[in-house]
């Protein structure tokens, strides 16, 4: 149903094509997964199917893309709307109405469908995606994950023959992601819908794919084949496949169920070893305040403090990175604390009401210097609201929030910027200037820092990016690194991140983990709201699970996630009842002779 014939795309001002030599056919009624590192042109390839490339994005498209016989070069996106449904990485960019029900109906109204057909399809979609309780809600009041489901629903209601989805589960909690993928699988199997999907969180989707298309590098010709065959050679692969390669399993498993069937031998090899205890992980037990911290002499492991968040650039040895970050952030020699440090933030019986909705109820939380806490829970559980309360964007209805002894909502933002910094779910929300240099100059002024402070951090976190680069021209990972540098300019003891791995591939996520571990080792307290269970397993000392605005679990990461079917990482599910969380832990044990 989709055919690419020697397709290449070159954007204005670039010296090489983003896509080149794409020559493949997507069969009708299959779910085809598009994979590859960040920046290889996955979104561009999807855009050629919907007609957004080149009609909306510009650039030159050579070759031919046809969808059910229609040439996308000669048919604009509106002329393909009855055939192709598209959801991009930013669902907010798609919304044209105010409420959930109106948004689901809008596409059908545009196509002139009968009112009784529209009503039936809206009801079906509300039930399919678990949106019935939200039908009258203003879209602006929904969480990011709820908005993602609405965006997917709005393209399902017209019943297109082809669905083009760019990161469709990136903002969804694990349970909601499974529900959406089950719906997509039902559309493929029962209705013959063709789904072309790009997704970085392969652990969620690869088991559902009929075929996988690998874009190995920018401008390189794609490779198409069976999921197991492609995962064996792909530079990006989910933990289940990584563990399978490490253990030498053949065929390569793509699901937890398949991996568990063959994991007996690996479990036996690991019986004599044990996962790192919490005391062996980076620990926040007795750090000094961030302003007094020195560079630790013995980081946890070389791999933990690996290179920057940007895709480009060689790894930096752990000691160098820790030392450079310490110098850039103005650290001085530590004074050994006699006991546990005072918490950076203390939340007591916090409740927040937004209109008729009680977003948080009696939440109590403390975070110590050097501690990393992952907030988890389903969409709408209150994670982003809690981060907003910590930074002062939301005032408590009852209870109290203290950051560095101050109430954030009642303190001048210019004073709070030195105590707490937030990297929002969309890093671009922090980026207003036309160049990286202008962003850095503004960050220095806002933080009262010496000129060049922010630029030095950008150079460390994002090497190779020129001063004149427009922030909107950066990749997702690069924008995240820039936003992180802007926030760190003020050297806040408390760092907050909302869904920091959205849009990042595994390599970029690994580099982000290295940077955040370095910051925690220097004494920064880190609180991150995430649906990424693999990130929590790699990074967090503690996991706090929220449900309907309440804390339902709070404890060491291993203890909380291993017992949870929804929030356990793939490695934990495969090797249970042993308490291994990550492939890197297993690799370390095997290399040590397990």
Question: Can you annotate each of these PLM segments?
Answer:
Residues 116-134, 449-467, 477:
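Conserved ABC ATPase "signature" region
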Residues 58-70, 399-407, 416:
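Conserved ABC transporter NBD signature motif
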Residues 228-282, 307-309, 313, 317-329, ...:
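ABC ATPase nucleotide-binding domains
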Residues 205-207, 536-538:
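A short, surface-exposed alpha-helical micro-motif characterized by mixed small hydrophobic
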Residues 199-200, 530-531:
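H-loop/switch region of ABC-family ATPase nucleotide-binding domains
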